[in-house]
Design a protein with these regions (language model features):
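FIC/Doc superfamily catalytic core
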Residues: 1-267
């Protein structure tokens, strides 16, 4: 039977929603987190949880199989093809991140920045950080709220404030005022966590999940990404920051690909 999200069940078969919710919430395969989720314009809060399912396990297996296939393919491709593959992947990732953030870009523009042909104030920081995943063997620290703020300052803060000075951070570490997330039509669909003290509290919980060795990596990074976006610690640049951190943690598991990348970018 195909897995259905609770939101789908709520709208398709509302009479089954509560029963399914409690079954999943109380399942022996469910992991609970000290994190309360409250939907926009909803009165009640609900404790966050992650229910391991057969579909999730099968999906992880498929992903790891594709990873193995990729490693085997990279063993036989010419260095020039590998270089073009890594360049194309990096360009696609930066462009996808920009598109999600609503920043118009072209593959040509980003490729020129990645290749060092031109310097772009809009993309220089994000490109430099993504290239550092391949060229720098030093570990990045994403263990504390201070680490997240320090990374954001290098990665996105300057570009964010250049685009809109009102988005400059005004709290001790994160934003002090409220922030809203809107749909393409302009409708508010979420408000970030407030006050800053609560942001710090929940982000600490989120970082603990990200670094929990007792959970599968793919589950950890997916949960981290969702909770980080829910918290929304910055006025702008939350999506690109979370996406980079996820990319970094996934890349750390692909040592062979990273080693090849370092050889190419340092050549």
């Amino acid at each position: 039977m195909e897995y259905e999200s609770l939101s789908k069940i709520y709208y398709k078969r509302p009479a089954e929603h509560n029963k399914t919710y409690f079954e999943r919430f109380n399942s022996p395969l469910t992991r609970h987190f000290d994190f309360q989720i409250q939907g926009y314009n909803h009165r009640n809060k609900h404790p966050a949880f992650f229910c391991y399912t057969e579909e999730f396990t099968v999906l992880m297996e498929k992903i790891y199989k594709k990873h193995e296939d990729l490693l085997q393919a990279l063993q036989v491709v010419p260095p020039l093809v590998l270089e073009q593959f890594i360049l194309s992947s990096l360009v696609d990732e930066v462009r996808a991140t920009s598109d999600i953030e609503g920043i118009h870009s072209t593959r040509k523009e980003i490729k020129e920045v990645v290749s060092g042909i031109v310097q772009s104030a809009r993309f220089s920081s994000i490109v430099a950080k993504y290239k550092s995943i391949l060229t720098d063997s030093a570990l990045m620290q994403f263990k504390t709220c201070e680490d997240i703020r320090a990374f954001y300052d290098e990665f996105a803060h300057k570009e964010v404030t250049a685009n809109d000075p009102t988005h400059k951070l005004d709290g001790d570490l994160f934003r002090r005022d409220s922030v809203s997330i809107t749909s393409p039509s302009g409708k508010i669909i979420h408000r970030g966590v407030q006050p800053e003290k609560k942001i710090v509290e929940l982000l600490n919980v989120t970082l603990e999940i990200l670094h929990n060795p007792d959970m599968p990596l793919l589950a950890r990074v997916a949960i981290f990404h969702y909770l980080f976006e829910y918290i929304h610690p910055f006025y702008d640049g939350n999506g690109r920051t979370a996406r980079f951190i996820v990319s970094y943690f996934l890349a750390r598991c692909c040592w062979q690909i990273m080693d090849w990348g370092r050889v190419i970018w340092k050549a």
